[in-house]
Amino acid sequence: MDTDTDTDTDTDTDTDTDTDVTNVEDIINEIDREKEEILKNVEIENNKNINKNHPSGYIREALVINTSSNSDSIDKEVIECISHDVGI
């Protein structure tokens, strides 16, 4: 009669938890990097839009000169409306 005894001992070290934690940290770091990149791109686009939508120094100077005159012309009223709309 052959009796087979199991001499194997299962030494299951739990490395899955360490791997999972590392993966979660990697994912969080990647999300943070992507978030920073997105915020930087949004800031760049906002600056482009501010520069594009804001009147140049020449227009601003002309508005100041024309609105500071004493005449009550229609041009002055139009210029005042424009300057108010663009936030000067």
UniProtKB/Swiss-Prot annotation:
Signal peptide: none annotated. The keyword Zinc does not apply. Residues 1-19 have a biased composition (Acidic residues). The keyword Flavoprotein does not apply. Keywords: Repeat. Sequence repeats lie at residues 2-3, 4-5, 6-7, 8-9, 10-11, 12-13, 14-15, 16-17, 18-19. Residues 1-22 are annotated as: Disordered. Induction: Expressed in the early phase of the viral replicative cycle. Residues 2-19 are annotated as: 9 X 2 AA tandem repeats of D-T. Belongs to the orthopoxvirus OPG197 family. This is Protein OPG197. The lineage of its organism: Viruses, Varidnaviria, Bamfordvirae, Nucleocytoviricota, Pokkesviricetes. The gene is OPG197.
